[in-house]
């Protein structure tokens, strides 16, 4: 757990999954934990590398959701990765607290979590050194982006209005910005589902892991 929260975002999803059964683990959970440990042993020298650039350090946050990814409960998984100086500084992978009835709903829930995180990080960075840039949240779902930017009320999203109103408010206030990102470059994808080796390595590079 310490490695997952401190230096290894690449195992965040795997650790999140096995942590769901802490109260009643079975043999399959033991197998999964051993697999994680073998992976860590084989990548023991992996760590986050930061490459600060003078006047060019941007706070970026990637938000993603795997709709209905938990086959036991039907709940979606939220993945968020925030980077600064080309390296991950904050991340989490967690199962959403209720069932999302659509991909858009799952993405909006994830975006609201990302917004809370990036607003907190912005204030933290501003306490350390003056930080005037507007941090950006990158989302690979166009409907979720439209909800964040559109001031009109949508009846079909009434059940999640608090979530998208929160994101929209922060966008309108200039606290955060939202951008579209292709699925290929959606870094948070690594925190919502199990990925094959080549794809995981690609996203690890984007998180500054090397």
Language-model segments: residues:
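Conserved pre-motif C helix in the palm subdomain of viral-like polymerases
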Residues: 1-12, 66-69, 77, 104-120
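RNase H-like nuclease fold core
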Residues: 61-104
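Eukaryotic intrinsically disordered and solvent-exposed regulatory patches
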Residues: 35, 44-47, 66-69, 97, ...
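C-terminal reverse transcriptase regions that engage the nucleic-acid substrate
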Residues: 1-48, 182, 190-192
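Beta-strand cores of modular interaction/reader domains in eukaryotic scaffold and signaling proteins
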Residues: 12, 49, 83, 138, ...
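Beta-strand-rich binding-surface signature
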Residues: 1, 10, 45, 59-60, ...
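RNase H-like nuclease module associated with reverse transcription
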Residues: 21, 58, 94-210
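Structured nucleic-acid-interacting core domains from mobile-element enzymes and related host factors
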Residues: 39-63, 129-131
């Amino acid at each position: 757990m310490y490695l997952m929260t401190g230096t290894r975002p690449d195992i965040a999803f795997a650790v999140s999954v096995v942590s769901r059964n802490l109260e009643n683990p079975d043999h399959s959970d033991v197998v999964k934990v051993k697999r994680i440990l073998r992976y860590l042993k084989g990548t023991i020298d992996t760590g986050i590398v930061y490459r600060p650039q003078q006047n060019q350090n941007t706070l970026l946050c990637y938000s993603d959701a795997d709709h209905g990814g938990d086959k036991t409960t039907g709940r979606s998984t939220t993945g968020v990765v925030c980077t600064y100086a080309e390296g991950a500084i904050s991340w989490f992978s967690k199962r959403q607290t209720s069932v999302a009835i659509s991909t858009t709903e799952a993405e909006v829930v994830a975006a609201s979590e990302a917004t809370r995180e990036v607003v907190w990080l912005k204030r933290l960075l501003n306490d350390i050194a003056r930080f005037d840039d507007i941090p950006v949240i990158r989302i690979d779902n166009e409907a979720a982006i439209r909800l964040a930017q559109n001031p009109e009320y949508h009846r079909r999203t009434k059940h999640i209005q608090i979530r998208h109103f929160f994101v929209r408010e922060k966008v309108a206030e200039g606290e955060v910005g939202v951008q579209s990102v292709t699925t290929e470059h959606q870094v948070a994808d690594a925190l919502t589902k199990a990925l094959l080796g080549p794809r995981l390595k690609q996203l690890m590079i984007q998180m500054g892991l090397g």
